[in-house]
Amino acid sequence: MRCLPVFVILLLLIASTPSDTVPLKTKDDMPQASFHGNARRTLQMLSKKQCCWYFDISCCLWP
């Protein structure tokens, strides 16, 4: 009985999705800055993770 309101809300959300007239974004539509930001974030994470490889856990700070 508790699932019924959740089910109704989900049905309403599905019904309110955009129609086919709206073009869907593809990976080609993404701005190049987001790719550079993702690469920079990955490199920063790997540089922070590198200190863990030397068993110095005190310097490992996960974002």
Swiss-Prot record:
The keyword Disulfide bond applies. GO terms for molecular function: toxin activity. Coiled coil: none annotated. Residues 20-47 form a propeptide. Its main location: secreted. Contains 2 disulfide bonds that can be either 'C1-C3, C2-C4' or 'C1-C4, C2-C3', since these disulfide connectivities have been observed for conotoxins with cysteine framework V (for examples, see AC P0DQQ7 and AC P81755). One of its GO terms (cellular component) is extracellular region. The modification Pyrrolidone carboxylic acid is found at residue 50. Residues 1-19 form the signal peptide. It is found in: Secreted. Disulfide bonds: none annotated. Expressed by the venom duct. InterPro entries: T-conotoxin. Belongs to the conotoxin T superfamily. The cysteine framework is V (CC-CC). This is Conotoxin TxMRCL-D012.
